[in-house]
């Protein structure tokens, strides 16, 4: 089961992984939801151990 965000990234609920629609890269979120606050006013994604304020910026 996966959640697709408005920016196109998908979050797999069972594995806790986020995949990028642009690069195909998969990011491990260590069991935490990659986006926090669904209003996207102050969205944060969690990726390799860091909170980062840009939901579209997976490096």
Swiss-Prot record:
Pfam families: Cuticle_2. One of its GO terms (molecular function) is structural constituent of cuticle. Keywords: Cuticle, Pyrrolidone carboxylic acid. It comes from the Eukaryota. The modification Pyrrolidone carboxylic acid is found at residue 1. InterPro entries: Cuticle_2. This is Cuticle protein 7 isoform a. The lineage of its organism: Eukaryota, Metazoa, Ecdysozoa, Arthropoda, Chelicerata.
């Amino acid at each position: 089961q996966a959640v697709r965000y408005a920016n196109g990234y998908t979050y797999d609920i069972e594995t806790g992984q986020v995949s990028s629609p642009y690069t195909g890269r998969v990011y491990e979120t260590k069991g935490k939801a990659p986006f926090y606050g669904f209003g996207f006013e102050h969205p944060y994604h969690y990726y390799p151990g860091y909170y980062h304020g840009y939901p579209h910026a997976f490096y």
